[in-house]
Amino acid sequence: MKVLAAIALSATAFTGAVAAVLTQEAFLNNPRIHHDQEKYLIELAPYRTRWVTEEEKWALKLDGVNFIDITEEHNTGFYPTLHSASYVKYPPKMQYAEEVAALSKNLSKENMKANLERFTSFHTRYYKSQTGIQSATWLYDQVQRVVSESGAAEYGATVERFSHPWGQFSIIARIPGRTNKTVVLGAHQDSINLFLPSILAAPGADDDGSGTVTILEALRGLLQSDAIANGNASNTVEFHWYSAEEGGMLGSQAIFSSYKRDRREIKAMLQQDMTGYIQGALNAGVEEAIGIMVDYVDQGLTQFLRDVVTAYCSVGYLETKCGYACSDHTSASKYGYPAAMATEAEMENTNKKIHTTDDQIKYLSFDHMLEHAKLTLGFAFELAFAPF
C-alpha cells in the first residue's frame, strides 16, 4: 500500500493529519472524509489524485484538464499505459467486407438528424437534472424500439436501464451471441454547461449527442443482419450510452466495475465522443478524417480500429492524443479491458463550442457522422464473429 501523497486543496487540518497516516485504501474507504465535506477524489493521471469540490471539478474542465472521479470506484490497479500490449488477438484483416458493405447502405443520415434534433431539445442532459432523466428515458425508448423492430428481442436481445444514485441512468443494449465474450460500443449521453450546470442550457449536439445518435444508427444497421439479430454471431455485442461522463466517467466506471466483479469477458471496447464537427479541420487546411486516439489505449485494438477505418470509411484517419481520462474508454481500461477511442478530428481541431449553449446541430456534418456510423458497424460486425 502507498501512503496518499496529495491532500485536497482546502482540506481541514484534521483531514491532513489523517491522510498522513492512512493508507490509500483506508483513506478511500472513509466516508466521513469526502461525503461530510462534499469532496470528490479525482485522478488527473495514473496515481495522481486530488480532493476537490464539485465547483472545482467544473473549473478544471473549463481549463481543459481531464480527470476521472474515483470517489466511489476505488483504485483497482488496472491503469492504462501509453504503449499497452494487447492480451487479445484481433483479426489481421477484414473478413466480412461484403456483409458490412451491404449493411452500411442502410445507414441513414436522416435518422441521425431527426434523433439528434429531438435529443438536443431537452434543456440540458446534465446527469443530476430532471431533464437529464427525461432525455435518458427518451433515448431508452428509441433503443428499445430499434431492438424490437429488428426482431432481435425474440432471440434474447435486451435493453437495460443501469441505475445510478444521481438520477440519470445509463443504457445497455445487449445482443447475445453464441458465447459471452463481449464487444462493447460506447458513447455518453449526458451534456453539461460548465458555467452553471444546474441552470443553463446544454444542448450538447456534438458532445456527445453526435456519438449517441451515431452508435444508435449503427445498432439499427447492425441488426439488419439476420445472423446478428438471431443470436448466431460468435460473440455478444453490447451498445452502451453512459450517464455522467462529464462528472468524471461516473456511469461507465459503475458499469465496468460491475463487469469486473461479475468476471465478464470484455474483448474490446470502442468509445466515440464527438463525431460531427469538421469545420475546425477544414479551417486549418487539414483533410476531413476520423481522429484515432493513440495514448492511453490498447495498441492492438487501436491498430484494428485503423484497419476498420481504412476498409469501411470514405475518409481516412489521423492519429491524435487526448491525454489521460478524456472519455469513457478510460473506465474500460481501468478495469483491465482493452479499449480504443475515435473522435471527429485531431484534438486541436475538434469543436470548441462544447460545454456551452452554442454546442448546436447547425455546426455539425451528418456526412461525417455517417462515416463514424460505418466505422461502428464495421467494428462491431467484424468482432462479433472474431475467433477470440
Curated annotation (Swiss-Prot):
Pfam families: Peptidase_M28
GO MF assignments: aminopeptidase activity; metal ion binding; metalloexopeptidase activity
Superkingdom, natural source: Eukaryota
Top EC class, one word: hydrolase
EC number: 3.4.11.-
Cell location: Secreted
Keyword terms, alphabetized: Aminopeptidase, Disulfide bond, Glycoprotein, Hydrolase, Metal-binding, Protease, Secreted, Signal, Zinc, Zymogen
InterPro entries membership: M28_fam (IPR045175), Peptidase_M28 (IPR007484)
Major location (coarse): secreted
SS bond partners: 322-326
Binding residue positions for Zn(2+) 2: 207, 246, 355
Residues bearing carbohydrate: 106, 180, 232
This protein's GO CC annotations: extracellular region
Residue positions binding Zn(2+) 1: 188, 207, 273
A biological process from GO: proteolysis
Keyword Cell inner membrane set for record: no
Signal peptide region: 1-19
Quaternary context: Monomer.
Free-text function comment from the UniProt entry: Extracellular aminopeptidase that allows assimilation of proteinaceous substrates.
Name of this protein: Leucine aminopeptidase 1
Taxonomic lineage from the root: Eukaryota, Fungi, Dikarya, Ascomycota, Pezizomycotina
